[in-house]
């Protein structure tokens, strides 16, 4: 068995004498593990840093085996992630959440989303918005997508300003006004892609964090990661007026 694909390094752990098990989010084969011989060496360390995109050739005798990876660099992002603390914390959080994807289940759209986010993550003005969009995309990939295009109460597509914490559906201003204190704000940029103010990004992270916690993490006995909290703190500092 053999194939070649693009992959984003999610994590690495030592295996035996000098080898490493590498976890990739591949473009066509989803989250996939493989052994890299000599992967624990200093020579291989720069290539195997989480966040890098690699060209991966996987070989195994049978498809169900873990198999071996031969990796070549495609996009090296180590310097960017080290230079921007919010980006490093953000990708750590993303990798931890991506680990919840079923192994070898294709998610090409999510692969493209993660790659695009990593390429723009250093930009402090867009980092918070990008993380919220990632969490929204991940919820959809896991079967818990939010419905933000029409009002749950009226079916209208206009004046969508709230989200119900129970249904995960948008609610228009008129229908939601009596219950506003029990609803989440719906930031416009999650619907129309416009550039948001910082307050809208905070609202978006509050929204996606709630559904990530209640629909994905808590049923698995997990909570929101420390890396996510560290990202939000670092991002807030990065955009604060000097």
Swiss-Prot record:
InterPro entries reported for this sequence: ARFGAP/RecO, DNA_rep/recomb_RecO_N, NA-bd_OB-fold, RecO, RecO_C
Protein keywords: DNA damage, DNA recombination, DNA repair
NCBIfam families on file: reco
Example of a GO biological process term: DNA recombination
GO cellular component, one term: bacterial nucleoid
Gene designation: recO
Similarity section: Belongs to the RecO family.
Species whose genome carries this gene: Xanthobacter autotrophicus (strain ATCC BAA-1158 / Py2)
Protein name: DNA repair protein RecO
UniProt KW DNA damage keyword: yes
Function: Involved in DNA repair and RecF pathway recombination.
The keyword Cell wall biogenesis/degradation is annotated on this UniProt entry: no
